[in-house]
UniProtKB/Swiss-Prot annotation:
Acetyl-CoA carboxylase is a heterohexamer composed of biotin carboxyl carrier protein (AccB), biotin carboxylase (AccC) and two subunits each of ACCase subunit alpha (AccA) and ACCase subunit beta (AccD). Belongs to the AccA family. Component of the acetyl coenzyme A carboxylase (ACC) complex. First, biotin carboxylase catalyzes the carboxylation of biotin on its carrier protein (BCCP) and then the CO(2) group is transferred by the carboxyltransferase to acetyl-CoA to form malonyl-CoA. Coiled coil: none annotated. The lineage of its organism: Bacteria, Thermotogati, Deinococcota, Deinococci, Deinococcales. One of its GO terms (cellular component) is acetyl-CoA carboxylase complex. Pathway: Lipid metabolism; malonyl-CoA biosynthesis; malonyl-CoA from acetyl-CoA: step 1/1. This is Acetyl-coenzyme A carboxylase carboxyl transferase subunit alpha. SUPFAM superfamilies: ClpP/crotonase (SSF52096).
């Protein structure tokens, strides 16, 4: 059987892991043997990443172990205090938030949290929020405006929760209200897609002065599976839909939908959470610095102009 580049990458990763485990178990210094292998591994990861298809990137965004919003908060924030409830129906663990210090700067966080293991993923519905989640986000944006706190949102969802109960409680209305409230923020708003950015569920907390995306994340009006089910009546056509939708970070930057692509460690953010967090933290902080010079009226005008300028049409 012919070996593929992916096979070679997995084989080298296994060799490095085995040597690292041996060094830890025996106390031997194997740095001399590990150094060239790690260099080769980084090179292979970069070459592999360069050849990934759009569907490959979608799969990478869903990789088990990819950093969640709270993984970044743990590494980048201090004084994080989660606030609960929408003051109407209840709390939603899929969309959380509250005040914190982002690398020392006071901010209001809005976070779509998928969960870190099977139990918490089920509890948080894999990051798919109910209406009370979006209404909680509106409440937190009200507080951000009142206290002059910049808003930082980390987006990671395939879409809003599609259940009957969510529709009965006004899912579409809640998303629309959240978008409207974010447009009217009089404080800086920086949004970053850190994994999946699907449909209105992502856009509800994605109306920022700056929108960023990590290198292996995706962002689209619908998930590839959803588009395939509608267009071809077959979710198995998701790879084809991903190509048609142009969902990747590079596509979005090319179309002007995001301002910047945040680089990830070779192979993906899940392989080095600390490095991924450092890159994300510094990029968001830089954009917050840039926006801090604008007046509230300037922020409103810039945000409105940004979203009105998206898209293109051709007159015939």
């Amino acid at each position: 059987m012919t070996s593929t580049p992916a096979d070679a990458l997995r084989e080298l990763e296994a060799r490095v892991r085995d040597l690292e485990a041996t060094a830890e178990r025996t106390g031997q210094n194997l740095d001399a043997a590990l150094a060239p292998l790690r260099t080769q591994l980084e090179t292979l990861r970069r070459e592999h990443a360069a050849g990934l298809s759009r569907w490959d990137r979608v799969q990478l965004a869903r990789t088990p172990g990819r950093p969640t919003a709270l993984d970044y908060v743990d590494r980048l924030c201090s004084d994080w205090t989660e606030l609960h409830g929408d003051r109407r129906f209840g709390d939603d663990p899929a969309l959380i938030g509250g005040p914190a210090r982002w690398q020392g700067r006071p901010v209001m966080l809005l976070l779509q949290q998928k969960g870190r293991d099977t139990k918490t993923k089920i509890k948080r519905r894999f990051g798919s929020a109910n209406p009370e989640g979006y209404r909680k986000a509106i409440r937190l944006m009200d507080l951000a405006d009142r206290f002059g706190l910049p808003v930082v949102s980390l987006i990671d969802t395939q879409g809003a929760y599609p259940g009957l109960e969510a529709e009965e409680r006004g899912q579409g209305w809640a998303i629309a209200e959240s978008i409207q409230r974010m447009v009217r923020l009089r404080v800086p708003a920086v949004c970053a897609v850190i994994g999946e950015g699907g449909s209105g569920g992502a856009l509800a907390i994605g109306v920022g002065n700056r929108v960023l995306i990590q290198e292996n994340a995706w962002y689209s009006v619908i998930s590839p599976e959803g588009a395939a089910s509608i267009l071809w009546r077959d979710a198995a056509q998701a790879p084809l839909a991903a190509e048609a939708l142009r969902v990747t970070a590079a596509d979005l930057l090319d179309m002007g939908i995001v301002e910047e692509v945040v680089p990830e460690p070779p192979g993906g953010a899940h392989l080095d959470m600390d490095a991924a967090a450092e890159a994300l933290g510094s990029v968001i902080s830089r954009h917050l610095d840039d926006l801090s010079a604008l007046t509230p009226d300037d922020l409103l005008a810039q945000r409105a102009a940004r979203f009105r300028s998206l898209g293109a049409f051709e007159e015939r």
